[in-house]
Amino acid sequence: MPTLWSPSTQHHGSSSGSESSPLQKSVRRAQMALSPCSSSILPCDDRDSQGTAEWDSPSTNEDSDFEDSLRRNVKKRAAKQPPKAVPAAKHRKKQSRIVSSGNGKNESVPSTNYLFDAVKAARSCMQSLVDEWLDNYKQDENAGFLELINFFIRACGCKSTVTPEMFKTMSNSEIIQHLTEEFNEDSGDYPLTAPGPSWKKFQGSFCEFVKTLVYQCQYSLLYDGFPMDDLISLLIGLSDSQVRAFRHTSTLAAMKLMTSLVKVALQLSLHKDNNQRQYEAERNKGPEQRAPERLESLLEKRKEFQENQEDIEGMMNAIFRGVFVHRYRDILPEIRAICIEEIGYWMQSYSTSFLNDSYLKYIGWTLHDKHKEVRLKCVKALAGLYSNQELSLRMELFTNRFKDRMVSMVMDRECEVAVEAIRLLTLILKNMEGVLTSADCEKIYSIVYISNRAMASSAGEFVYWKIFHPECGAKAVSDRERRRSPQAQKTFIYLLLAFFMESEHHNHAAYLVDSLWDCAGSYLKDWESLTNLLLQKDQNLGDMQERMLIEILVSSARQAAEGHPPVGRITGKKSLTAKERKLQAYDKMKLAEHLIPLLPQLLAKFSADAENVAPLLQLLSYFDLSIYCTQRLEKHLELLLQQLQEVVVKHVEPEVLEAAAHALYLLCKPEFTFFSRVDFARSQLVDFLTDRFQQELDDLMQSSFLDEDEVYSLTATLKRLSAFYNAHDLTRWEISEPCSRLLRKAVDTGEVPHQVILPALTLVYFSILWTVTHISESTSHKQLMSLKKRMVAFCELCQSCLSDVDPEIQEQAFVLLSDLLLIFSPQMIVGGRDFLRPLVFFPEATLQSELASFLMDHVFLQPGELGNGQSQEDHVQIELLHQRRRLLAGFCKLLLYGVLELDAASDVFKHYNKFYEDYGDIIKETLTRARQIDRCQCSRILLLSLKQLYTELIQEQGPQGLTELPAFIEMRDLARRFALSFGPQQLHNRDLVVMLHKEGIKFSLSELPPAGSSHEPPNLAFLELLSEFSPRLFHQDKRLLLSYLEKCLQRVSKAPNHPWGPVTTYCHSLHPLEITAEASPRGPPHSKKRCVEGPCRPQEEESSSQEESLQLNSGPTTPTLTSTAVKRKQSLRTVGKKQKGRPGPGPGPGPELICSQQLLGTQRLKMSSAPCFQIRCDPSGSGLGKQLTRLSLMEEDEEEELRLLDEEWQRGDKMLHSPSSPSEHGLDLLDTTELNMEDF
C-alpha cells in the first residue's frame, strides 16, 4: 500500500523521480516562503542542530537512527499518471476553472451569509445543508465555490468578502493580505471564542459542517481536483496568517478536514483490500469458471481505488506539511491542542499509515508544553493508543524515549493532567509488561494518600493492577470466582497490610481505603474475611498488623455507610445518585448484620490496647442500630454493654473515653425499644463513678497530702466523669458542687495537684452548659440568677487559674473562660430570647486586661521563647501551633461579638506582619469583620496599633536613629499592610484615611523637644509610617494635609537649621509632582482631556493646574492593546508636521520644574496652601503650559475650591467623631473587596 508522506523524508523527496501535483508544488513553494522566525510559532531551542536524535528535538532535518531501518522497507510511491490541473494558488496570469470562459455567465457576488447563518443557528441538518450547497455548486461552480470560501472567511470573524473579480485577478496570498487589511477587529473575540449563547455551539456545528462536506463529496467532488485542492490551498495560507482569528479558525478547519480525509482513506484501503481478495479469488478459478470481463472490471476498479487513494494521500500530505507541521507549536495554546488532538485520532483510526515514530515524536515533544490543555490532549491521545494492546506493542521506541516524562507528569501542577497521566501509566502497566521499573511505580504509590480524590483514585487503580491483581487474579479463573475466593481475599488483605506498613503513613488508613474503593471495593467490603483474620488465633499477626487491620476495617465500614470520602479529601461530587443511595443502604445493613454479633468479641480481645479499642467503638456510628430490635439481637447488646463498662473502667485515655461515651450516647436514644436497658446500664456506670469520686474527694479534702496512687485514681475518675458529662446529662448526680469546692481549695491553698484541676474545670464547665439547655421561658428569675451566680463564680476561678504556674491549667482556663463569656454575651438574647437577658454577662476591665496579657504571653511568642525546635518532633510543633491558633481564635471571637472592647484588637493587629505566617489568616479575618462592625473605629485601632509599637520602640531604643532600626522597618511593612487592607475603594474610605493622617500628625507632634534643644520631636519619625497611607489619598486631600501639617509645625518653638528628614519624607509622599517631573521633565504627558486655550494664568494658579495634570498622569501607563490585524502605518513625518504646525510666537526653552519653596534654614517650615512646586510659564505653544491638560473644574478660583474642600473635610470630621452604627456609615457588608482582599 502506498504510504503517506513522512515528516522525516521531506528533504529526501526532491530526489524522487515521481512527478508532483500542482497542489504539492504550491505547498512546497509556500513552505519555502515561510519565515522560520514567525511570530506565531513557539521558539524551539536547539531543534535544528545536526546529529540530534529525532526524538530529542523537532528538527527540520528530522532524521533518526531507527527511522533509517524503517525507511528502507518503505516502497516509494510510483509516479502518478499526468495529474489533474489543480492549481493550489491563483495567479493573475493563470486562469482557473472558477473564471467563466466567455460563456456569458453572470458573475454577481453570491450570498455570503447563507451557510454561515445556518451553521451558526445549528437548527438545520448538516447533511441537507451540504446537499443544498452541492446543488448550487453544480448549477454554478463559480458562485458555489465563492460561497464556500466566504463561509470560512466569515467563520474567522472577518466581515469582508472575496468577490469574483478578486479571485480572478489575485493570488491566494494577495487575497489573504487584502482580508487582513480589511479585518476590523473591534474586540479580541471571534466566532470560535466569542461569548454568549449564540456562539456556544458554533465550534461543534462548524466541525460537523466540515465533516459532512467531505462525507458528501467523497464519491463526487472530492476527486474532482478543483474545489477541494483550492480550498486546502486557501486554508494553508490562512493558517499562516498573523491574525489569530484566521490562524485559529483555518487550523481547526484544516485539521477536521484532515480527519475526515483519514476516514475516507481508511475506507478506500478497506475497499482496495476487498477488491484485491476478489481479484485473487477470481484469478485462482479454473479456465472454465474464470470470467475475463470480471477480472478486467476488478482491475479497473483497483486502478480507480489506487488513483483515489493517491489523491487522498496528496491532500493529506499537503495539509500535514502546510498546516500541522507549523501549527503544532503555534504560540496560541488552543491551536496546539487542536493539532495534538487530531493527530492522536489519526494514529488510532489509521494506524498503518500514521502510527510510526515520525508522527509520534510530535506528541512526545508536546508533552513538555507549558499550557495545561495541550499537555492534557497529549496524554489523552497517548491513552487512546496504549489502551489497544496491539497498537501499544508498536510504540516500544516511543515508550523508551518518553517514559521518564510521562512518569514525571503524575506530579503535574494541574490535577487534571496528573490524573490522566496516572491513567496512562496504568494502561502501559497493563499492556506493556516490564516497561515501568520499581522506581517509576514508587512515584505513584504515595499519591494514594494525597487530598485530591481524583488523583488518589487513579493512583489506587494503578496500585491495584500493579500489586493486587497479579496475585489475587492467579487464585481464581473467572472474575466471579475471584470475588468470592477466600484464598484470593486473604491474599489481598496480606498484600494490603504489607503495602500499608511500607508506606509509612500509618495514620491514614481512611485515605488508602478511599483510594482503592472504586477498583477494589468488593475486597474491602468483605468484612467477614477481615474479622476472621482478627479473631483467629493462628494468623500470626503482629501488634502493628492487627492495629492496621482494625483501621482498615473501620475505614471500610465508614466508607460503605457514609458513601463519601474521608474528611480532608477534595471531591467534586455533590451528592449520591439513587442507585448509590440504594447500594449504601444495603451495605449498611449487611455491615450491621455481620459486625453486631462480633463487636463484643473484638472488644474483649483488644480491650487492653487503647489504640485498638477506640476505633472499634467507632463502628457503632456506622450501624443501623434498629437491627438490635428487628432481628432479636438483644443478647449481643447485653454483651456490648458489659464490654463498654469494662473499657471505661480500664482506660483513662481521652480518645477511648470519648469513643465509649459517644457509643453509649448512640444507644441511649428514646426511640429505641431497648432504651430502658441501656439507660439502666448507664446509670449503673455513673453511680459507680460518682461513688468512687465522693470517696476519693473526701480523702483529699480531709488530708493535706496524697500519694501518687490516690492522685492517679482521683484524676482517672474525674476524667471518666468529664468525658461522660460531655455526651450525657449528669445533672441529677450533682457532682458540680463538689468539683467547685475542690477548685476553690486549689485556688486558695494551692495544695490540689494540677492533674486533678484540669478535669475538674471541664466538669464544672459542662455542668453549666447542661443547665443552660434546660432553661425555657417558664424558668423562674430565681433559677436564672442562681445559674448566673454559678457562672460568675466559675469565671472567677478560671481568672485565678490564669496566673497558675502550670501552663496546661492556664490554657485550659483561658479556653473555658473564652467559651463561657461568648455564650453569655449579648448575642444570647438574639432571636427572640429576651427571657435570657438576666444571664448576659460583661467582663470587668481587670478580666479583659488579664485575657489580653495571657494572649501576649502564650500566643505571640518570640522564636527564642518557643524552646529548641530541633529537640521537638515536627508533629509536636504542629500541635503546639494549632493550640496557639485556637487560643488566638477564641480571643478574636470575644472581640467581634462585643464581649471585649474593640480597642483591645490593637494587641492583635500590631502582630499582623510579624506573625503573618502563623496567624495571618485569623488576624485578616478579624480585621475584615471589625471593619464591617465599625469602619471608623477599626481605622483608629489600626493607628493605635502603630502608636503602641512606636511607643514601645521609643522606650527601648530612644528617639535617636529610629528609622534605621530593623524594628522600625518592620513597622513600615506593617503600615503598608494596613494601608492595603483598605482595598481599592478609595472614595469609600476617603474620610477614614484622612482622619488617620490627621490623628497621626497630631501624635507625631504631641511631644516637643525641650526648649533650646536642637533635637527633633521624639515622635516625629511616626510621619514615615503615615507616608505608607498616602497613596490612598485623593489629590485634594493631600493638599489639605500639607496645609494642616504647616499649621501644626507653626507651634514648634524652634525650627531646625535643615529640613527634618521625616517631614521631608512625608511631604514627598503627599507631593507626587516632584517625582513625576524629575522623571520626565520634557515631553507632554499623554492626556485625553481637552487643552485650555488662552493666556498664561498667574503663577500660583498655573502651578496648581500643572500639579493636578501631573497627578492624573503619574500612574502607570495603560498597556497597549495589540491587535492581530495588520493596520496601515501612519507616517511619523506627518505627525511631526502636525506638531510643528501649531501656532506659537517662536521657539522657547524647554519646560522646567522649579521648586518655589523649600524647607530651609533657621526659619519655620514655609508651606502654603498652594503646591510647593511651580512650572515656568512658556509663552510658546510647545511648552507644558499649553500641552498639559486640565479639568474644567480646575478653572475655578483656587481659593474658593480650597474653602469648599475644607468645609467638606470639617463635615467629615464631625461625622467621624460622632458615635454611629456601621449602617449609618453606609457600610456594605457584602462588599467583596472588604471580605476577600488578596493583597493584605
Curated annotation (Swiss-Prot):
Which top-level group of life is the source organism from?
Eukaryota
Q: Which SUPFAM superfamilies does UniProt cross-reference here? A: ARM repeat
Stretches of Basic residues bias are at 1126-1141
**Record PTM Phosphoserine, positions in chain:** 1218
Q: In which tissues is it expressed?
A: Testis specific.
Q: How is it modified after translation?
A: Phosphorylated.
An example Gene Ontology cellular component term from the record? lateral element
Q: Report biased composition (Low complexity) as residue ranges.
A: 1-25
Which GO annotations describe the biological process of this protein? establishment of meiotic sister chromatid cohesion; female meiosis sister chromatid cohesion; homologous chromosome pairing at meiosis; male meiosis sister chromatid cohesion; protein localization to chromosome
Which residue intervals make up region (Disordered)?
A: 1-108, 1077-1154, 1213-1240
Q: State the oligomer form and interacting partners.
A: Component of the meiosis-specific cohesin complex, which also contains the SMC1 (SMC1A or SMC1B) and SMC3 heterodimer. Such complex likely contains RAD21, or the meiosis-specific related protein REC8. Interacts with CCDC79/TERB1; recruiting cohesin to telomeres to develop structural rigidity.
Q: Which family does it belong to?
A: Belongs to the SCC3 family.
Protein role: Meiosis specific component of cohesin complex. The cohesin complex is required for the cohesion of sister chromatids after DNA replication. The cohesin complex apparently forms a large proteinaceous ring within which sister chromatids can be trapped. At anaphase, the complex is cleaved and dissociates from chromatin, allowing sister chromatids to segregate. The meiosis-specific cohesin complex probably replaces mitosis specific cohesin complex when it dissociates from chromatin during prophase I.
Q: What is this protein called?
A: Cohesin subunit SA-3
Q: What is the lineage of its organism?
A: Eukaryota, Metazoa, Chordata, Craniata, Vertebrata
State the gene name recorded for this protein: Stag3
